[in-house]
């Protein structure tokens, strides 16, 4: 218990001294995670005017903020989370578990037939500090996000997933490679150095293009 308290205290000290945290507050963003998305988007050009985006595990909304800025008035950003989220300009929010039928029905009504260009997931489990517990949970969330993306994306859609290196990562990565034509792994500078988190970018789903 003392070790966990010490770890939490260290994390808090680092968090409030973090230059990305300071920048996020100064620029009006809700979390430092926005800079990870910015860095990936700069390289991959996932977001652009008129695109339709679904943001899984969106709260507190940093990714949704950036996405709304990038897609503009002609685009759409639909944020989903089991947690509440404050309203955000240019973002439609659905609170609930995206596996549940009523939530999926609300999503379909919100999309109103629009083709989804990007599904992005910044979901992570509540960390216990025990890798044997946290890693399987993280991989499971990644599998859920992938299944959602496979069902939701348009024929040339893209998928952005935060996950963690460790047991189960290679298997998840291989499944993603089988379903998308181009897959890359990113470790953006805004990720903390000792963190095992990485971001998988998968593009051009083969689902509706005759691929396997």
Swiss-Prot record:
EC top class named in words: transferase
Annotated GO CC locations: cytoplasm
GO molecular function: rRNA (uridine-2'-O-)-methyltransferase activity
Binding, S-adenosyl-L-methionine: 61, 63, 81, 97, 122
Key word S-adenosyl-L-methionine present: yes
Stored Pfam families: FtsJ
Places the protein is found: Cytoplasm
Entry-linked Gene3D superfamilies: Vaccinia Virus protein VP39
Enzyme active site: 162
UniProt keyword list: Cytoplasm, Methyltransferase, rRNA processing, S-adenosyl-L-methionine, Transferase
Similarity annotation: Belongs to the class I-like SAM-binding methyltransferase superfamily. RNA methyltransferase RlmE family.
Name this protein carries in UniProt: Ribosomal RNA large subunit methyltransferase E
Organism encoding this protein: Nitrosococcus oceani (strain ATCC 19707 / BCRC 17464 / JCM 30415 / NCIMB 11848 / C-107)
Gene: rlmE
